[in-house]
Curated annotation (Swiss-Prot):
GO terms for molecular function: protein-lysine N-methyltransferase activity. Belongs to the methyltransferase superfamily. PrmA family. S-adenosyl-L-methionine binds at T152, G173, D195, N237. It comes from Hamiltonella defensa subsp. Acyrthosiphon pisum (strain 5AT). This is Ribosomal protein L11 methyltransferase. Its EC number is 2.1.1.-.
Length: 305
């Protein structure tokens, strides 16, 4: 089925009203993205950040009711124009889109990737480049983590560099489960994934089953993990603000002499995150990839944050 897409560029104060108007005129989905190039870093707990200028896209079915949809869209545009105050900009365009299986379309451009010396992440639809390597089979899905982002790549390269034989690893903020699964395939005897998102737990479980390691992966929604839980290796690829806020919680998960890997950190945020952990850990040199970095450390025998 072909589709009609209306894209609107305007100020952020119209976001809720525009979303309502698009849905009321028959849009089957409404998405938001940055209309310019404004970086938005992670919000503090309870804070909601949004771009100043937004692009809102409404997607409509181009079926037998095409004329009706176009009439409704035109009416919506007129309403939106009337809302704009003098000096506020409003740009829109209407596009006709061919029908595609969008997830499959994205997967066409997702190729096998190598991390370190042993580890590959490969989509299920493509041949594994090196069958003798450590291969994680992973497709794009609902939860974060396929290896394409620099922070995930930094964590995978670090895991590949470790001797994980018979080790227990905690993946704090597990997303797709890619780091926990990679650790198991690299020799860890058990991996524990923790996340605040039920979709991440589901995605991690499905991906572990696909990779044949589900028996060795334990998953918890955040807050439901056992007390006094500890592991030989802890990796947390989240964001700088929660890494700082939860420094005590994350540090307690690492056994004395255990290893910690942190990412989701911009290069400009590395000092702040390092300071949150330096009292309990001996920090290694920071690794960088593009504008992102990874902090690694070993826990002191007598720690305290």
């Amino acid at each position: 089925m072909p589709w009609i897409q209306i894209k609107i560029i305007t100020s952020k104060q119209h976001d809720n009203l525009l979303e309502t108007l698009l849905l009321e005129t028959g849009a089957v989905s409404v998405t938001f993205q940055d209309a310019g190039d404004q970086p938005i870093f992670e919000p503090l707990p309870g804070e909601l950040k949004f771009w100043d200028d937004i692009e809102i896209a409404g997607l409509y079915e181009a079926d037998n009711n095409l004329h009706e949809h176009q009439t409704k869209i035109a009416a919506a545009i007129n309403k939106i124009k009337a809302m704009c105050e003098p000096g506020q900009h409003f740009i829109y365009k209407i596009e006709h889109l061919e029908d595609k299986q969008w997830e499959r379309e994205w997967m066409i451009h997702f190729h096998p990737m190598r991390f370190g010396q042993r580890l590959w992440v490969c989509p299920s639809m493509q041949a594994v480049p090196d069958p003798s390597a450590v291969n994680v089979i992973l497709d794009p899905g609902l939860a974060f983590g396929t290896g394409t982002h620099p922070t995930t790549a930094l964590c995978l390269e670090w895991l590949d560099s470790l001797d994980l034989q018979n080790k227990i690893l905690i993946d704090f903020g597990c997303g797709s489960g890619i780091l926990a699964i990679a650790a198991l395939k690299l020799g860890a005897k058990q991996a524990i994934g923790i996340d605040i998102d039920p979709q991440a737990i589901e995605a991690s479980r499905d991906n572990a089953q696909r990779n044949g390691v589900s028996e060795h992966l334990v998953l918890y929604l955040s807050g439901q993990e056992p007390k006094n839980l500890q592991a030989d290796v802890v990796v947390a690829n989240i964001l700088a603000a929660p890494l700082c806020e939860l420094a005590g919680v994350i540090a307690d998960l690492v056994k004395p002499d255990g290893y910690l890997g942190l990412s989701g950190i911009l290069n400009t945020q590395s000092d702040k995150v390092s300071q949150a952990y330096q009292h309990a850990f001996c920090l290694y040199p920071i690794a960088e990839k593009e504008e992102w970095c990874r902090i690694t450390a070993v826990k002191n025998k007598n720690d305290g944050i």
